[in-house]
């Protein structure tokens, strides 16, 4: 695809170059009348002689312009034929190998472009033959414009446009984008490590470490009594501790320092024992809670199980009795219904019968 885009740009540039090269030549011949010398003529020279000398220069200009138009037409035909041949031959190769296709394109353009220096040489020869006034004008109109239109435009289309899709687009994903993630990842990973080191140096995290160490040593060793107190004090603000120490130092004498140490030693084991007791009590309470939960779950399951067993046993007993006493149950039901329909005669009924008789 890049190769096809470059070919289209080349064809557009050549199409623009041809009319632009022909227009300046026509305008220069129409707009530039025969130049008259600014210096005064000598008295012995006639104006007719000077006009005769200028006429051959005009004829030479026209012949040279025709030759340049022919060369431009030839170069355009050769460029178009070269482009068509390159497209016909290298379409398959460009799809398979775009780099080799770009290299071949550059080679063909380099082979076709060296026609321009010949035009420059012809323009220089023309200036030498025709003289200073006509040579300068002809170079400005024909040589400069033809070089600008053919050489510069073809270079722009071939060099700039053909290299843009290959160089810049191919280099961006490999060079720029591939290096960015690799450079950013280590920076992100290194920053938390540096922050951790700085925090430990400043003394922000030793409080947590002291708490964990104090908790472990309370469970393990009961002799170290001062460290748990320090761990408890570490949670308090540092400013309050400093103010308390200053007040104690001002109010109490120096002799009271050993007494304080003894009091701390006396209070240390008791506080450590109390803390150990609280820890053990909390552990026991947690264990009891676990046991209670487990026992409650097991008892609930067992109670449901026994209830199901009892109900099943009662149902089995009732069904067994009913199966073996079918006749009695049926006779009892039938006799009850008959007794309601047929009654036994009472004594009063018999007495009434006797009276009638």
Swiss-Prot record:
Q: What is this protein called?
A: Trans-Golgi network integral membrane protein TGN38
- What domain of life? Eukaryota
Q: How does it assemble?
A: Interacts with neurabin-1 and neurabin-2. Binds preferentially to the dimeric form of neurabin-1.
Region span, Disordered: 20-101, 113-299
* UniProt keyword Signal present: yes
Which residues of this chain are annotated as glycosylation sites? 25-26, 140, 147
Query: Could you tell me where the Acidic residues compositional bias lies?
Result: 247-263
Disulphide connectivity of cysteines: none
Phosphoprotein keyword on record: yes
Q: What is the protein's membrane topology class?
A: Single-pass membrane protein
Q: Where is the composition biased (Basic and acidic residues)?
A: 55-72, 92-101, 117-128, 192-204, 213-246, 282-293
**Parts of the chain on the Lumenal side:** 18-303
Biased composition of type Polar residues is found at 23-33, 73-91, 159-168, 176-191, 269-281
User: Which positions bear Dimethylated arginine?
Assistant: 74
A GO CC term assigned to this protein in UniProt = trans-Golgi network transport vesicle
Q: Which UniProt keywords apply?
A: Glycoprotein, Golgi apparatus, Membrane, Methylation, Phosphoprotein, Repeat, Signal, Transmembrane, Transmembrane helix
Please give the residue positions where the record annotates the modification Phosphoserine.
Answer: 234-235, 271
Main localization (coarse)? Golgi
| Residue ranges with Pro residues bias | 34-43
| Record's signal peptide | 1-17
- Which regions face the Cytoplasmic side of the membrane? 325-357
Task: Quote the biased-composition stretches of kind Low complexity, using this chain's numbering.
Answer: 129-146
**Per the record, which residues fall in region 6 X 8 AA tandem repeats of [PT]-[TS]-G-[GVS]-D-[SN]-[DN]-[NK]?**
133-180
One Pfam family linked to the record: KCT2
Start and stop residues of the sequence repeats: 133-140, 141-148, 149-156, 157-164, 165-172, 173-180
Annotated GO biological processes are: Golgi to endosome transport
